[in-house]
A protein has these predicted regions:
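Catalytic-core regions of core metabolic enzymes
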Residues: 1-453
């Protein structure tokens, strides 16, 4: 698996001079993403492509062979890579097991060739791998637009590892990662998984120092028991978005990756046993990854809803109770501090509504008082339209001093949104989603509020 995520040399089968072909895109992505290892192009015509020497057949072993050829030529390419001693190969073509029995037979042949050579095989019917590499990316995929890499691993999160059975879902993930400023460490599309499965990738990511949170998009689990056992051993949060839950979805999954979706009730029970967080929707999946990628898991369920917006604060409180969070009132000493700083009509319960009339200079101290309260293991911040710099500054400073996890909903205040985002505070698109993302970080909770064992 090291050769897949951290290769030192790469061969691109199907590399083409024709800019319209996917083999050209793949080679260009490898060359321009920031990978500084050895790159070889494999093309029957030989010569040179994009400044890289091209060979008709691989003459030496490389760590990773990226195979972008039609399905009919895939077996020959895999055999060539295996014969040269490659450690791993990724077959990006489609037209295999998802098409029926004949395609499944071709898949089986690919797996047989790889197994005989002790070469790991990803795919077929996948979109490739994206992995942090020094200050850039190993972009062994068809994705042409990736997030800007952090200046160093761990900065800006730099922490989420994604395994997806769907290549197109990877496009959704990278678009959301850019929009949410989500730190990304690794991405692997496993496709039809004739050899490398989501469980294999999960096991590798579990011990990867660059990955702190793991996300998985799956239409079905081919090795359900292996996956559950691997998830149980994993010491990192795992968030799963499971497709193919209903009859129509299961049929679509079968035609897409040639897999069986299984009974979702049994899948949910297995997730619960393994402590896996299951997201109910793609929005929830990305919300939870955003929260877990930016903040440490909350040590408990006691939370403060800190707001200057009455109605949205109540919505957040309703969601918190529904999801199993506790909303204790502040202790008497904390309440006195807040009352001394906020208007007399401020609500000093939970939610704690400082009101827009709070003197700007008082916001930092009042916010710090909330964060200092021992009953609160974390804080959910709500601000609808109050453009007072001291509010954002107070939240950032209090979070930095206490280290308590925070999620936020900020509406129509770009200056404060930017300040909180720069500080690594997850910004969600509604009060309820801010609460749900926080709840996923709380020990023993899932986004739906169901307790995990």
């Amino acid at each position: 698996m090291d050769a897949i995520f951290e290769p030192r040399s790469v061969a691109v089968y199907g590399a083409s001079r024709d800019e319209r072909k996917l083999g050209h895109t793949l080679l260009r992505n490898v060359l321009t993403g920031g990978f500084d290892g050895r790159v070889i192009a494999v093309n029957p015509s030989g010569g040179e492509i994009l400044g890289v020497r091209a060979v008709s057949a691989l003459e030496e072993a490389v760590d990773l062979a990226l195979i972008s050829v039609p399905a009919a030529s895939a077996s020959a390419a895999v055999a060539d890579a295996a014969g040269a001693g490659c450690r791993a190969a990724i077959v990006l073509a489609s037209g295999f097991g998802e098409t029926g029995p004949q395609g499944k037979a071709v898949e089986a042949r690919l797996a047989e060739i790889a197994r005989a050579a002790n070469m790991r095989l990803v795919g077929p019917n996948c979109i490739g791998v994206v992995s942090r590499h020094r200050d850039g990316w190993l972009n062994g995929s068809y994705f042409w637009r990736l997030p800007d890499p952090p200046r160093k691993v761990g900065e800006d999160g730099g922490s989420v590892g994604i395994v997806s059975q769907s290549g197109a879902f990877g496009g959704m993930f990278f678009a959301e990662a850019r929009r949410r400023r989500l730190g990304v460490a690794r991405f692997l599309s496993v496709g039809n998984s004739v050899d490398v499965t989501e469980s294999d990738a999960l096991e590798w990511l579990s011990s990867d120092p660059a990955t702190s949170v793991i996300g998985l998009f799956a239409e079905a689990f081919r090795e359900g028991r292996h996956f559950v056992a691997t998830a149980e051993r994993c010491q990192k949060p795992i968030v799963v978005l499971k497709a193919g839950k209903g009859g129509a979805g299961a049929r679509a999954a079968a035609s897409h990756t040639g897999s069986l979706a299984g009974r979702h009730g049994a899948v949910q029970a297995a997730f619960a046993r393994a402590g896996v967080i299951e997201a109910a929707s793609s929005d929830e999946f990305f919300d939870v990854l955003q929260a877990l990628g930016a903040i440490s898991p909350a040590p408990g369920r006691g939370v403060a809803v800190l707001t200057i917006s009455g109605g949205p604060g109540v919505l957040a409180s309703d969601a918190a109770e529904r999801l199993g969070l506790r909303l204790p009132p502040p202790g008497e000493w904390t309440a006195r501090r807040i009352r001394h700083l906020a208007p007399e009509f401020a609500a000093v319960g939970n939610p704690i509504d400082l009101t827009p009339q709070c003197p700007p200079a008082s916001f930092p101290a009042a916010i710090q008082a909330v964060f200092d309260e021992p009953a609160y293991q974390g804080v959910i911040v709500i601000n609808c339209g109050l453009d007072i710099p001291e509010f954002g500054q107070g939240v950032v400073a209090a979070r930095r001093r206490t280290g308590k996890p925070v999620t936020a909903f900020v509406l129509d205040v770009p200056r404060i949104e930017s300040e909180l985002a720069e500080a690594g505070i997850p910004l969600l698109s509604s009060p309820e989603r801010a609460v749900a993302a926080y709840a996923a970080t709380a020990r023993g909770l899932s986004p739906s509020g169901q307790g995990a064992p």
